[in-house]
Regions:
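Acidic, Mg2+-coordinating catalytic module of metal-dependent nucleases/exonucleases
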Residues: 101-110, 114-115, 119, 153-185
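Hydrophobic, well-ordered secondary-structure scaffolds
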Residues: 4-12, 160-162, 176
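Substrate-recognition/cap helix-loop segment adjacent to the acidic, metal-dependent catalytic center
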Residues: 93-96, 111-132
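Active-site-proximal helix-loop-helix substrate-binding element of RNase H-like nuclease domains
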Residues: 49-52, 61-65, 135-175
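A short, structured active-site edge motif that brings together acidic residues
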Residues: 39-45, 128-144
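Generic detector of well-ordered alpha-helical packing
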Residues: 4-6, 113, 137, 174
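Conserved non-catalytic scaffold segment of RNase H-like nuclease domains
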Residues: 5-107
Length: 185
């Protein structure tokens, strides 16, 4: 499962952060186990804007301003740990390769794929996976779950508590999407 947080809805928008979680549909994992398996990367915004002409959308900045302070700190506040975009792409690819390479990558719609692929090309890196490996969570949930509404559904798992999901934190968004695929009703 893959998720990015961005500063726009175009493929050339700044990528703030990304998370990826490997999962196997045969494994019966819980939400906390998914969080533990995640890779989270935060990217340097200034480098993306100044060196690669990535876009910052005013409306998206206004949207971020209305989000919870924790997720704003996680994704928006510059940190010494922010990665050069090329390093972030390499880390994501290394994570994927540690689980056997080109596997199916699930994401919530097409923006995640377009953004990370565009960024990889801009910084001269290989894309994290081939274009045909991407799958859409929303479509799967809408087709497979009787409680589906707008790409979300109820999750039936004894330890899962929806209120523990931190919306717009890419790791939590990934874990929720996996839970819906595995345990959606």
């Amino acid at each position: 499962m893959f998720d990015v947080e961005t500063l726009g809805v175009e493929s050339t928008s700044v990528v703030l952060s990304a998370s990826i979680i490997h999962f196997d549909s045969n494994d019966k994992v819980d939400y906390d186990q998914l969080l533990e398996k995640a890779l989270f990367v935060k990217l340097d915004v200034d480098i993306q804007v100044k060196q690669y002409n990535r876009i910052i959308d005013k409306e998206t900045l206004e949207w971020w301003d209305k989000q919870h302070n924790f997720v704003k700190r996680v994704s928006l506040k510059p940190s010494d740990d922010d990665l050069h975009p090329a390093d972030a792409i390499r880390k994501l690819r290394e994570y994927i390769n540690s689980y056997g390479g080109d596997k199916t990558i699930w994401a919530r719609g097409s923006l995640d794929q377009m953004s990370i692929d565009s960024l990889a090309v801009a910084v001269g890196e290989e894309k994290i996976v081939m274009y045909n490996m991407w799958r859409d969570v929303r479509t799967a949930v809408d087709l497979l779950c009787e409680t589906a509404k707008d790409g979300y559904c109820e999750v039936v798992h004894p330890t899962f508590k929806r209120h523990n999901v931190i919306k717009h934190h890419p790791t939590h968004d990934c874990a929720l999407d996996v839970m819906m695929l595995l345990y959606g009703k």
